[in-house]
Amino acid sequence: MVLCKPLTAPCATEIGVTERGDDILIVRKTDALWGLPKLMQETRVDKGDPADPVNFDLRRQQTATIMPIAVAFPVAIVLWFGTYYMLPPLAGMEDVVARLVFALKCSCVAILFCFVTGIEAVAHERLRSPAIDPLSGYDTPRMRVNLRYLQNTLEQLAPFVAGVFGLAVYCSDGRSIRAVPATTVVWIAARIAFWIGYHRSSAQRGIGAPGMVVSILVLLYVCTRFGFEIAGTVGAIVPLVLFVGAEGLLFWATKPLHHR
């Protein structure tokens, strides 16, 4: 492997070629005989290592992550209410079973366009690269992003699906059930935005944050309604208080450790 100094410019040697990204230096070895790139020998060197508190600018990364989030939330709110009010009331939704079936259909749409597409993206890249052998150790930045997207989407599917099913239970008619497709549209859009943003930079994945937030809000609504059924107003307040307390505890417990 050949590293070129300074890191601000690309360079070439008899055995290697470097390319400079915004935050990454990529070094590729070339075949000494044929001069062809060896895909198995691509090396990525982080210039700002998060494990190194001296060189990693946390505040800059936080600012870069928060900005897309701030832009995404107003768009998500408009999208949710726009979907809700533009859809006509749905017929035959007075029966809870019909509403649950409708929630299942919405979940299927979300899984198809957000999860299955991620699986296909990884599968296509494996088919057309040395990664067709999963044990070869070959990967690319694109594949790593797609794999992280898949893992994150799988994690977020659980609260989303549970939320839309619970929401369907408490939507009493064809008018209020429109909240289910509105939530689904926002979640799908947020997942796609997260995926595209992640490929641009790790900070821009924050544009998908409204997807998780809408799932949390729906679950809180379902839990407060459930609590009200059990113990009235007090029962409705308890889940909110406990969740806010848990968030505060997690915020405190996950603060970074100071290195000497």
Model segments located where?
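Long, highly hydrophobic alpha-helical transmembrane signal-anchor segments
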Residues: 56-112
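Hydrophobic core of alpha-helical transmembrane segments in multi-pass integral membrane proteins
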Residues: 69-85, 111-122, 220, 239-254
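Membrane-helix interface/capping segments
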Residues: 116-140
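Short membrane-interface loop/juxtamembrane segments of multi-pass integral membrane proteins
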Residues: 134-156
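Core segments of transmembrane alpha-helices
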Residues: 151-166, 217
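Hydrophobic alpha-helical transmembrane segments and immediately flanking/interface helices
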Residues: 166-192, 254-259
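Alpha-helical transmembrane segments and their immediate juxtamembrane interface regions
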Residues: 180-215
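Hydrophobic alpha-helical transmembrane segments in multi-pass integral membrane proteins
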Residues: 217-232
